[in-house]
């Protein structure tokens, strides 16, 4: 899947964007940049923004704070050397943030994240330090029946992601993922996205409409069409 994405999916999407004059942001892994430098050079040459997306698509929730910091530092270094400037955007692998992610991003000068879904069509300031009590069925119920406590807003903007504006769940087949599909047509996906866009256009005077596509799914002919 990864080799197809780099060798076939990326060039096809770049041709599509060039044909319609679309400028995009690519969340890329450091591993992909180092493995396929000639492919990713074309993304930069076409004027698209490069954001960080882990080194090997590591889940932040599965890492220690030191591991997460090392992954961020390595990926930022790879992209900075490749593009000639430090990335300012972050798209978390799996769209998961650990309790340490926000602080680590701010320490490294990241200006925005695009992984969370507290809103759907409007940017918002992220908070650091949200807390809630997890359910532990081995304990008395009173131990977890406590409200969520919001943390403090920080200077890190969230451009909200959305599973309903993501091509992967409906168009990408992955054997180990119970919710993967892969047999939804591009026309069906376009209809869902068009309905959302029409609703936003009618109900908001200001909004962002952030679509997420992947070269290993959107780069397939039946989706491109």
Give the role of each language-model region.
Residues 1-49, 210, 225:
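Active-site beta->alpha N-cap acidic-glycine motif
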Residues 10-14, 37-41, 69-76, 102, ...:
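Generic structural signal for well-ordered alpha-helices
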Residues 2-7, 25-37, 58-69, 91-100, ...:
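Acidic-and-aromatic substrate-binding clefts and catalytic sites of carbohydrate-active enzymes
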Residues 17, 50-53, 90, 105, ...:
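Conserved, mostly hydrophobic/aromatic
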Residues 204-225:
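Extended, basic/helix-rich recognition subdomains
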Residues 80-81, 85-205:
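Active-site-adjacent pocket scaffolds in enzyme catalytic domains
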């Amino acid at each position: 899947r990864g080799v197809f994405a780099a060798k076939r999916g990326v060039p096809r999407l770049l041709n599509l964007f060039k044909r319609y004059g679309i400028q995009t942001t690519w969340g890329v892994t450091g591993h992909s940049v180092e493995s396929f430098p000639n492919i990713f050079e074309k993304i930069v040459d076409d004027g698209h923004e490069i954001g960080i997306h882990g080194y090997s698509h590591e889940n932040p929730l599965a890492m220690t704070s030191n591991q997460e910091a090392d992954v961020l530092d390595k990926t930022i270094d790879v992209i900075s050397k490749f593009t000639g400037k430090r990335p300012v955007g972050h798209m978390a692998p799996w769209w998961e943030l650990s309790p340490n992610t926000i602080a680590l991003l701010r320490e490294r000068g990241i200006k925005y994240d695009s992984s969370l879904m507290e809103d759907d069509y409007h940017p918002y300031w992220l908070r650091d330090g949200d807390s809630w009590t997890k359910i532990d069925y081995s304990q008395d119920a009173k131990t977890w029946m406590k409200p969520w406590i919001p943390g403090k807003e920080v200077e890190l903007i969230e451009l909200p992601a959305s599973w309903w504006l993501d091509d992967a769940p409906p168009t990408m087949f992955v054997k180990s993922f119970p919710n993967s599909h892969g047999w939804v047509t591009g026309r069906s996906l376009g209809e869902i996205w068009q309905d959302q866009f029409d609703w936003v256009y009618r109900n908001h005077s200001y909004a962002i409409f952030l679509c997420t596509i992947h070269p290993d799914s959107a780069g397939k002919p039946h989706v491109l069409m």
